[in-house]
Amino acid sequence: MNVNQGTVGSDPVILATAGYDHTVRFWQAHSGICTRTVQHQDSQVNSLEVTPDRSMIAAAGYQHIRMYDLNSNNPNPVINYDGVSKNITSVGFHEDGRWMYTGGEDCMARIWDLRSRNLQCQRIFQVNAPINCVCLHPNQAELIVGDQSGVIHIWDLKTDHNEQLIPEPDVSVNSVHIDPDASYMAAVNSSGNCYVWNLAGGMGDEVTQLIPKTKIPAHKRYSLRCKFSPDSTLLATCSADQTCKIWRTSNFSLMTELSIKSNNPGETSRGWMWDCAFSGDSQYIVTASSDNLARLWCVETGEIKREYSGHQKAVVCLAFNDSVLG
């Protein structure tokens, strides 16, 4: 990504943010200009994800997922998925766009067939606590589910078998992620800790084996999100402590701390860092925070390159896709 250069015509960079003001905003990443605002009337937006073909964006909220068209200015959702009783906290897609997965506070992870005209979910994985996060293994065959009781579930979609991990009993798992190389899995929780495992197996019919690698005392307050960089060399953790920290995966040492803390002693907290996403070249990261802003940072220097201002309430999720399809 080049932060100083735009493109003529269709922008290959998709940057969308959403949160508690019931809007999804689309931005020109390099300039900070808001190019489109979609009213998401029903509820706050908890999670955003762009479809693999970059044609639509999914917004997960209370009891529903709304799909908006990225290639037109149609203000209305083009597809609605309903029938979930509580908040949907996580949404994502199979790499070929065949199905969508969600997790929610109704204690269920779901698989939705996107090729079917029937907008019902096809498979359900029930756990014993509200689900905060779901991520798909790069092998496209296992879903990792984190819940509020502190359990991480590995759901094998081929066999329906599942394994459980409990890094800290009764401490809510808020985010899980696997790096693109499928070398590591990270999870962060409400005590601020980040757990990292080495991955083995997971190819063919083999179930992924998780070997504990390290525990990072990443934050002193809730840790809300963890994301590996596309080149698998970095891990970002976001927290209620107003920081996003970037760790090197070579030794899990701290490389950069991105902070929205005020230098003014009289100013109260600017709020939580809720979400983050790396650029395709792993050199930049976008963060979403409850001071109503998203920011673009240089990973190496920690310098803020752009601020995206326009939301009226907390920004809690974002989608950032600057990969150009071949």
Curated annotation (Swiss-Prot):
Gene Ontology cellular component annotations, sorted alphabetically: cytoplasm; lysosomal membrane; TORC1 complex; TORC2 complex
Which keywords fit this entry according to its UniProt record? Cytoplasm, Lysosome, Membrane, Repeat, WD repeat
SMART domains xrefs: WD40
CDD domains reported for this sequence: WD40
Keyword Cytoplasm attributed: yes
Disulfide bonds, which pairs?
Answer: none
Compartments annotated for it: namely: Lysosome membrane; Cytoplasm
Instruction: Report if keyword Thylakoid is assigned.
Output: no
Could you name the domain of life of the organism this protein comes from? Eukaryota
Give the chief site where it resides: membrane
GO BP annotation list? regulation of actin cytoskeleton organization; TOR signaling; TORC2 signaling
Q: Where would I find the WD repeats? A: 1-37, 40-80, 83-122, 126-165, 168-207, 218-257, 268-309
One Pfam family hit: WD40
Entries under PROSITE patterns matching the protein: WD_REPEATS_1, WD_REPEATS_2, WD_REPEATS_REGION
Q: How does it assemble?
A: Part of the mechanistic target of rapamycin complex 1 (mTORC1) which contains MTOR, MLST8 and RPTOR. Component of the mechanistic target of rapamycin complex 2 (mTORC2), consisting in two heterotretramers composed of MTOR, MLST8, RICTOR and MAPKAP1/SIN1.
Q: What does this protein do?
A: Subunit of both mTORC1 and mTORC2, which regulates cell growth and survival in response to nutrient and hormonal signals. mTORC1 is activated in response to growth factors or amino acids. In response to nutrients, mTORC1 is recruited to the lysosome membrane and promotes protein, lipid and nucleotide synthesis by phosphorylating several substrates, such as ribosomal protein S6 kinase (RPS6KB1 and RPS6KB2) and EIF4EBP1 (4E-BP1).
Q: Which family does it belong to?
A: Belongs to the WD repeat LST8 family.
List the protein's name: Target of rapamycin complex subunit lst8
Q: Which organism is it from?
A: Danio rerio
The UniProt gene name for this protein comes to mlst8
